[in-house]
């Protein structure tokens, strides 16, 4: 039973104290969280995500038609962090102006990881 990465979420730096971290979730429930800068928990942590949580996230991705969203939401503005979200084989760059439904999906992934790390914010 090989593990395949089915989703990831990465937050990049801004000019302030934006949290910088990387999350990967695999089909077998294995997940990694790597807290880089301005986060409560730093370093690489291995986590176990329930199949139910994975199913909920994948269901939400399907509901918002993730595969057909634009590949990039960006604007000519500086200082903002960038979020890269990947579900299955599609990756989206969310810098500015992404639809609310995409933000909700990002938050779902974050909430599952926050819950596993037993913290309220990154």
What residue ranges belong to the model's regions?
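Short, well-ordered, aromatic-rich surface patches in folded extracellular/luminal domains
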Residues: 1-15, 39, 43, 64-122
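An acidic/histidine-cluster motif and surrounding catalytic segment
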Residues: 18
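A short, structured beta-strand/loop element
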Residues: 22-33, 79-82
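A short-motif feature that recognizes glycine-rich, charge-decorated loops
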Residues: 32-67
């Amino acid at each position: 039973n090989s593990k395949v990465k089915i989703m990831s979420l990465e937050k990049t730096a801004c000019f302030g104290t934006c949290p910088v971290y990387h999350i990967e979730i695999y089909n077998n429930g294995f997940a990694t969280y790597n807290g880089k800068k301005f986060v409560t928990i730093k370093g690489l942590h291995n986590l176990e995500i329930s199949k139910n949580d994975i199913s909920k996230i994948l269901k939400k991705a399907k509901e918002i038609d993730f595969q057909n969203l634009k590949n990039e939401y960006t604007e000519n503005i500086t200082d903002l962090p960038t979020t890269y979200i990947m579900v299955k084989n599609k990756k989206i760059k969310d810098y500015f102006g992404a639809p609310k439904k995409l933000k909700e999906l990002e938050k779902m992934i974050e909430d599952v990881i926050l819950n596993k790390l037993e913290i309220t914010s990154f």
